[in-house]
């Protein structure tokens, strides 16, 4: 068993960060009138663990006993059978950013809300809970349909929605929910968890090992635990996927050398297809590329234009287009920007200029004194 599964918090007292959000959820669950809830935060911030504890506060530990149930979905022209995880008290739905999500949500929620369970009265709750993960994957029409469905079944159901990016959720849907924004853990929190797991697993970490984990985890606790797991197994934490992203970034930067652009673009497309088959979302691919490119390009104007290309591509992705089309639009825009500015000197922001100006003045004073 992987460490991040083995050491997942079993009790609320085991949760070491974002304890203020946990206290607010516990207080909210103690009231009779529980609102719809949105929990938003980046990957690795503990959103799923918070949802688990919230369900235990609402009902009891029986919510962790899950089983699969099949639902028949009738779309506009197709019929599907989908397996959904559920307990006696709640159901878990994960949208897949397809055109069928609207019908999946409507049909599953309708069938689940109509099904009465007498076990629910043990907890004195008059409602069941519907948990929806990755709600930002829903298109605008699906989110509008979900809002209408929430209003229809408000007496018998409560909705807990989880997302990475709150800005992708339409305002009419957000206005009907109580929102909790969950930040990433601090380096101190991650260091505490890593030291605890290393002690329990008898893994000896020196200062360089700890520094490597903390510097490369990007404040993502799951990534840090994965690095520790690889250290315990004496294997490299960097997988082929990371190498594929690095190859794409190197190929994009190579266009500044004046080499064959068409060959570079074909190499990039091959690596992007290799990344896409791992089932990573297009928006996540663009975000990773933006982060890696900005770290390597020392020009504030180019970096600003890269972010603009990324925002346009990510906006188009939310409208249900093919991921590869918008990813290639982003990459082509970045390559065009680099080619047009390859002979220009890098431009700095005002803060950077002021810092360099101060350094030059202090150096000149030293030379005068000498």
Curated annotation (Swiss-Prot):
Entry keyword set: ATP-binding, DNA replication, Nucleotide-binding
Bias (Basic residues): 354-370
Composition skew (Basic and acidic residues), residue ranges: 342-353
Stored InterPro entries: DNA_pol3_clamp-load_cplx_C (IPR008921), DNA_Rep/Repair_Clamp_Loader (IPR050238), P-loop_NTPase (IPR027417)
Disulfide bridge partners, by residue number: none
CDD domains recorded: AAA
A GO molecular-function annotation: DNA binding
GO biological process: one example: DNA-templated DNA replication
Keyword ATP-binding: yes
Region of interest called Disordered, as start-end residue ranges on this chain: 342-370
Binding site for ATP: 41-48
Role summary: Part of the RFC clamp loader complex which loads the PCNA sliding clamp onto DNA.
Family: Belongs to the activator 1 small subunits family. RfcS subfamily.
Designated name of the protein: Putative replication factor C small subunit L478
């Amino acid at each position: 068993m992987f460490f991040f599964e083995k050491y997942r918090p079993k009790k609320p007292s085991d949760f070491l960060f974002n304890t203020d959000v946990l206290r607010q959820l516990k207080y909210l669950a103690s009231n009779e009138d529980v609102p719809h809830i949105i929990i938003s935060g980046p990957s690795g911030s503990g959103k799923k663990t918070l949802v688990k504890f919230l369900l235990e506060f609402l009902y009891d530990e029986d919510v962790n006993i899950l089983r699969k149930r099949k639902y028949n979905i009738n779309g506009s022209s197709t019929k599907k059978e989908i397996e959904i995880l559920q307990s006696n008290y709640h159901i878990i739905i994960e949208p897949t950013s397809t055109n069928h999500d609207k019908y999946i949500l409507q049909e599953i929620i309708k069938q689940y809300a109509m099904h009465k369970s007498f076990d629910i009265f043990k907890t004195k709750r008059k409602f069941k809970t519907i948990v929806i993960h990755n709600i930002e994957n829903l298109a605008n029409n699906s989110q509008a349909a979900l809002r209408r469905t929430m209003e229809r079944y408000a007496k018998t159901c409560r909705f807990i929605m989880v997302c990475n990016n709150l800005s992708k959720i339409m305002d009419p849907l957000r206005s009907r929910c109580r929102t909790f924004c969950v930040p990433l853990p601090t380096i101190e929190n991650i260091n505490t968890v890593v030291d605890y797991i290393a002690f329990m697993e008898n893994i000896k970490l020196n200062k360089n090992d700890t520094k490597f984990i903390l510097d490369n985890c990007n404040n993502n606790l799951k990534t840090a635990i994965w690095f520790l797991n690889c250290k315990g197994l004496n294997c490299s934490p960097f997988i082929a996927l990371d190498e594929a992203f690095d190859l794409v970034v190197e190929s994009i930067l190579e266009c500044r050398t004046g080499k064959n652009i068409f060959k570079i673009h074909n190499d990039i497309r091959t690596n992007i297809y290799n990344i896409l088959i791992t089932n990573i979302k297009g928006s996540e691919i663009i975000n990773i590329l933006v982060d890696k490119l900005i770290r390597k390009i020392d020009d504030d104007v180019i970096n600003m234009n890269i972010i603009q290309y990324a925002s346009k591509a990510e906006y188009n992705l939310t409208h249900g287009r093919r991921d590869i089309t918008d990813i290639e639009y982003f990459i082509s825009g970045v390559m065009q920007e680099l080619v047009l500015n390859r002979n220009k000197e890098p431009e700095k922001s005002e803060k950077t200029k002021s810092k360099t100006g101060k350094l030059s003045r202090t150096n000149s004073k030293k030379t005068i004194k000498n």
